[in-house]
């Protein structure tokens, strides 16, 4: 039916003029934002004329008719008629030229910043543009003329989300569309005849479907026989961050077309999204073998190899055409290479502090998934006797499984990369006293790189040290302490920094009554492993045997901080404190090891407790007070850590006579008595102030 001709308004002319001068429909145009220049009054939007965009609906049959899906506009109170758009193609659809078809490309990694498509989205057949939807219609009024008017979102300040589209053109970082939360989808064309409806951005999907990504489209694609269609839906899943679903679809596409390099490259992209870097490398290598001239697979493989710290292999793939495919990535590669060289040089001269600096710099420069660089930091911490840092850094080492065959034989600091990982692991296992694990790790390193002298020497050392330690343990259990000490000494000759062997030999000296030598070995063990509690306990016991009560109390106090609930340590500390007081001539009559806070129920009981010799700490509280509830557990812990002090608790609600006698008006209040005299009163104490006061008066 012919449309009636309406006079063109001034806003229409301005809109057409700006649209014609600023908007184009170039296929390879970078990411863009549609510019609406209609009436600033209405929130409704109309279909811009002369533009082809990625469609949000699809044709349902091969006939000339098609239906447009409706979408929700950006203004919630005003419904909008959805736009039916045509799919981007490499040819000009108006001229009917279908000779040019886009080449199938694969996904880029998230870390790259180059103007290539995110995922391969080539179509297996040409598609027809959908009919243009009617323009929005406004009611007549004195502001806008009646009839059809170009409407804009010019007055809207609300931000719109960026949605990855599915066009076939080269858009830079994928096909980025501007929208209000609706995911666009291009028409499904299975190549035969009719197109299947696609409603990827439908707001009516259930939350469970959105969470899993297993939509009807996904289920249909996974059973499909058209590899291009399967790949297209896989790309949609990838763009939404549904990497598991995308991976399954790429697997299906590869099963249908095993020699297609783009499918394998896309599968690698999904694996990268799942942090399965080792598998992604293998997939890229398979893609390159399938199509040695496929630049996208070479580029993605180069980026992965940079992340793994494999700079030589990465350069080969980055410059496979004789020149770098991405100058920015080449700069990243060169930065990683520079710091790697400095790191290896510093390791060669055992400058472990520089090793830490350069390894960190290489990781920050781009080698953020390199196991050998992380293990190099572990080794540096170990050599600097910072075992706690080495252990925590060991947990951060990236797991590359399976380790790529092409990477395993490349060299790092003179040994195979994979062998170096086990080389360091053997050292840290031995330092922690897990000798059997150390032997297995050293054997693994030796199997991977049997010709490396450094690996062979470590394997021999670890094996001999483990044997010496096992022999020493057997002799110690048989109470042959002198022979056991000799066995441990043999292990220390091979590994002179092993805290476990020093501690074991100290135990032998203790049993033989050689307290001074026991203390010396404990000092050595603590030098190499400061947080190791066993040598601290043995040194405290040796100091007690030699009646060095001050040193013994100091060691036991350090132990009680590490082991606050250990009753044996608390009791040993109490006896050492009593002995120290006695050696100073202080009165120690009737001092008993308590270990628990004593609750007072009567004024007579309170007065009796005040007359006890030594230091008494009284905690005045009420059961209902929040601050009292917070401080009570801390008072209990102080009682365990300072066993020579009497800790008493008074609930002034239950015993108001005591509160009145002591003039307690605010809780919590702590009073400290020494030999029956009050020396300190603290109202609402903090934990720090309370502990400082207790420690001060316990000495």
Curated annotation (Swiss-Prot):
Segments passing through the bilayer: none
Residue ranges of the region described as Disordered: 1-211
Basic and acidic residues biased stretches: 9-20
Function noted in UniProt: Involved in responses to osmotic stress and abscisic acid (ABA). May act as a positive regulator of ABA signaling during germination and seedling development under stress.
Biological process according to GO: abscisic acid-activated signaling pathway; positive regulation of abscisic acid-activated signaling pathway; response to abscisic acid; response to osmotic stress; response to salt stress
Full protein name: TPR repeat-containing thioredoxin TTL1
Disruption phenotype: No visible phenotype under normal growth conditions, but mutant seedlings show reduced root elongation under salt stress and increased germination rates under osmotic stress and exogenous ABA treatments.
Composition bias, Gly residues: 166-182
Database matches in CDD domains: TRX_family
Pfam families, per the entry: Thioredoxin, TPR_1, TPR_11, TPR_8
